[in-house]
């Protein structure tokens, strides 16, 4: 008799994806972030569902409903803070996952990589809309500033912004539609993630060496199920430490003030995970130029496979490229810091230099390093 997990139509899919899947024997902890992103997504959908049961998407009651969740709903405070800080964990895992892909050359799996970029953009859009929902000062002004960027698009810009707002300013219509989109998008993300996984399983996982591991595979279960479970436990531990000891560490105090269209906060800034892109946007004095730079700072990921010049896939044995990779990481941290600072000297200059460096590293220096390394190895 055939094992049910190999014969049942549904179980067969699960079996081929999570149990009998042939996996490289040498993938490190950097390969844990894919499953951790899955854990984050499930956690966000569950906590979000319970929050949606008590939340009202009306400008007059949205702020009060969030306060009500924290004060009157049983364990509402923990659900709210798990959801808010869960987003931060989500982005930490996302950036680590993308960084791993860049370092080890996983972007040569073109379909998987491009679906991943689409996922990244969708998650960013979802997080942005979620930040608007509590209807605090930073929610309102963040929504106003970011949606207003679209008005830089020639000819159709103003109409586009008013169409997104559903009126002449960020108001009730905007909040309602943002809530609707914020609710539906995680399920769309889950569906796209399935496609991401489907394309990955067409080729099999990459590994730290960047060399094909077809000659030597091990089953996913029990080796990587155990490893992923440990990763998930550590992730939940980190999240709960944040939620229970410093729930507001990554938030903005301005969001505890109800939204007021007549009073602008002194420093409008997004959540920490968008600060690098916000710094790039602010570093260009021209509105349209800033918007294009902002868009390109994320969309540049699509070009990465085209910019790969090395004859080796991974950076594991490429010290020159490694130096540039970690310079890029430092540059992104610098941009994140600058994005949270006021627009004044010396921050503006540092931001402009870091922005130039960001594009220079990806578009010029890293491809050049790949070519130089080929020459050094006489390839």
From Swiss-Prot:
<dbReference type="GO" id="GO:0045275">
    <property type="term" value="C:respiratory chain complex III"/>
</dbReference>
<feature type="transmembrane region" description="Helical">
    <location>
        <begin position="288"/>
        <end position="308"/>
    </location>
</feature>
<dbReference type="InterPro" id="IPR005798">
    <property type="entry name" value="Cyt_b/b6_C"/>
</dbReference>
<keyword id="KW-0472">Membrane</keyword>
<keyword id="KW-0999">Mitochondrion inner membrane</keyword>
<keyword id="KW-0249">Electron transport</keyword>
<feature type="transmembrane region" description="Helical">
    <location>
        <begin position="113"/>
        <end position="133"/>
    </location>
</feature>
<comment type="similarity">
    <text>Belongs to the cytochrome b family.</text>
</comment>
<keyword id="KW-0496">Mitochondrion</keyword>
<protein>
    <recommendedName>
        <fullName>Cytochrome b</fullName>
    </recommendedName>
</protein>
<keyword id="KW-0408">Iron</keyword>
<keyword id="KW-0813">Transport</keyword>
<feature type="transmembrane region" description="Helical">
    <location>
        <begin position="33"/>
        <end position="53"/>
    </location>
</feature>
<keyword id="KW-0349">Heme</keyword>
<comment type="function">
    <text>Component of the ubiquinol-cytochrome c reductase complex (complex III or cytochrome b-c1 complex) that is part of the mitochondrial respiratory chain. The b-c1 complex mediates electron transfer from ubiquinol to cytochrome c. Contributes to the generation of a proton gradient across the mitochondrial membrane that is then used for ATP synthesis.</text>
</comment>
<feature type="transmembrane region" description="Helical">
    <location>
        <begin position="178"/>
        <end position="198"/>
    </location>
</feature>
<comment type="subunit">
    <text>The cytochrome bc1 complex contains 11 subunits: 3 respiratory subunits (MT-CYB, CYC1 and UQCRFS1), 2 core proteins (UQCRC1 and UQCRC2) and 6 low-molecular weight proteins (UQCRH/QCR6, UQCRB/QCR7, UQCRQ/QCR8, UQCR10/QCR9, UQCR11/QCR10 and a cleavage product of UQCRFS1). This cytochrome bc1 complex then forms a dimer.</text>
</comment>
<dbReference type="InterPro" id="IPR030689">
    <property type="entry name" value="Cytochrome_b"/>
</dbReference>
<dbReference type="GO" id="GO:0006122">
    <property type="term" value="P:mitochondrial electron transport, ubiquinol to cytochrome c"/>
</dbReference>
<dbReference type="Pfam" id="PF00032">
    <property type="entry name" value="Cytochrom_B_C"/>
</dbReference>
<keyword id="KW-0830">Ubiquinone</keyword>
<dbReference type="InterPro" id="IPR016174">
    <property type="entry name" value="Di-haem_cyt_TM"/>
</dbReference>
<keyword id="KW-0679">Respiratory chain</keyword>
<dbReference type="InterPro" id="IPR027387">
    <property type="entry name" value="Cytb/b6-like_sf"/>
</dbReference>
<feature type="binding site" description="axial binding residue">
    <location>
        <position position="182"/>
    </location>
    <ligand>
        <name>heme b b562</name>
    </ligand>
</feature>
<dbReference type="InterPro" id="IPR048260">
    <property type="entry name" value="Cytochrome_b_C_euk/bac"/>
</dbReference>
<dbReference type="InterPro" id="IPR048259">
    <property type="entry name" value="Cytochrome_b_N_euk/bac"/>
</dbReference>
<dbReference type="GO" id="GO:0046872">
    <property type="term" value="F:metal ion binding"/>
</dbReference>
<dbReference type="GO" id="GO:0008121">
    <property type="term" value="F:ubiquinol-cytochrome-c reductase activity"/>
</dbReference>
<feature type="transmembrane region" description="Helical">
    <location>
        <begin position="226"/>
        <end position="246"/>
    </location>
</feature>
<dbReference type="GO" id="GO:0005743">
    <property type="term" value="C:mitochondrial inner membrane"/>
</dbReference>
<dbReference type="InterPro" id="IPR036150">
    <property type="entry name" value="Cyt_b/b6_C_sf"/>
</dbReference>
<dbReference type="Pfam" id="PF00033">
    <property type="entry name" value="Cytochrome_B"/>
</dbReference>
<keyword id="KW-0479">Metal-binding</keyword>
<keyword id="KW-1133">Transmembrane helix</keyword>
<feature type="binding site" description="axial binding residue">
    <location>
        <position position="83"/>
    </location>
    <ligand>
        <name>heme b b562</name>
    </ligand>
</feature>
<feature type="binding site" description="axial binding residue">
    <location>
        <position position="196"/>
    </location>
    <ligand>
        <name>heme b b566</name>
    </ligand>
</feature>
<feature type="binding site">
    <location>
        <position position="201"/>
    </location>
    <ligand>
        <name>a ubiquinone</name>
    </ligand>
</feature>
<feature type="transmembrane region" description="Helical">
    <location>
        <begin position="347"/>
        <end position="367"/>
    </location>
</feature>
<dbReference type="InterPro" id="IPR005797">
    <property type="entry name" value="Cyt_b/b6_N"/>
</dbReference>
<feature type="binding site" description="axial binding residue">
    <location>
        <position position="97"/>
    </location>
    <ligand>
        <name>heme b b566</name>
    </ligand>
</feature>
<feature type="transmembrane region" description="Helical">
    <location>
        <begin position="77"/>
        <end position="98"/>
    </location>
</feature>
């Amino acid at each position: 008799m055939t094992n049910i997990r190999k014969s049942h139509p549904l179980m067969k899919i699960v079996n081929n994806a999570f149990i009998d899947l042939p996996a490289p024997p040498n993938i490190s902890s950097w390969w844990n972030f894919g499953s951790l992103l899955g854990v984050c997504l499930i956690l966000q959908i569950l906590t979000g569902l319970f929050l949606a049961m008590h939340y009202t998407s009306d400008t007059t009651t949205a702020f009060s409903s969030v306060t009500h969740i924290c004060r009157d709903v049983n364990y509402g405070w923990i659900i709210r803070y798990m959801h808010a800080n869960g987003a931060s964990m989500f982005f930490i895992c996302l950036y680590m996952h993308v960084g791993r892909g860049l370092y080890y050359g996983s972007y040569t799996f073109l379909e998987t990589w491009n679906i991943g970029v689409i996922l990244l953009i969708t998650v960013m859009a979802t997080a942005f809309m979620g930040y608007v929902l509590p209807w605090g000062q930073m929610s309102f002004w963040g929504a106003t500033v970011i949606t207003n960027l679209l008005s830089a698009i020639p000819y159709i810009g103003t109409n586009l912004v008013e169409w997104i707002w559903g009126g002449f300013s960020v108001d009730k219509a905007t909040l309602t539609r943002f809530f609707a989109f914020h609710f539906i998008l995680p399920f769309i993300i889950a569906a796209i993630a399935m496609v991401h996984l489907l394309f990955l399983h067409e080729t099999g996982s990459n590994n730290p060496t960047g060399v094909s591991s077809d000659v030597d595979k091990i089953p996913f279960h029990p080796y990587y199920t155990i490893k992923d479970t440990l990763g998930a436990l550590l992730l939940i531990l980190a999240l709960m430490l944040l939620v229970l000891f410093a729930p507001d560490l990554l938030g903005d105090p301005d969001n505890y003030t109800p939204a007021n269209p007549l009073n602008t906060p002194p420093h409008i800034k997004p959540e920490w995970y968008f600060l690098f892109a916000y710094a790039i946007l602010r570093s260009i004095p021209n509105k349209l130029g800033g918007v294009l730079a902002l868009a390109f700072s994320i969309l540049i990921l699509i070009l990465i496979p085209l910019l790969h010049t090395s004859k080796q896939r991974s950076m594991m044995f490429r010290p020159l490229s490694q130096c540039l990779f970690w310079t890029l990481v430092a540059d992104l941290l610098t941009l994140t810091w600058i994005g949270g600072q006021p627009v004044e000297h010396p921050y503006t200059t540092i931001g402009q230099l870091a922005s130039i460096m960001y594009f220079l590293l990806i578009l010029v220096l890293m491809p050049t390093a790949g070519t130089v390394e080929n020459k050094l190895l006489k390839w």
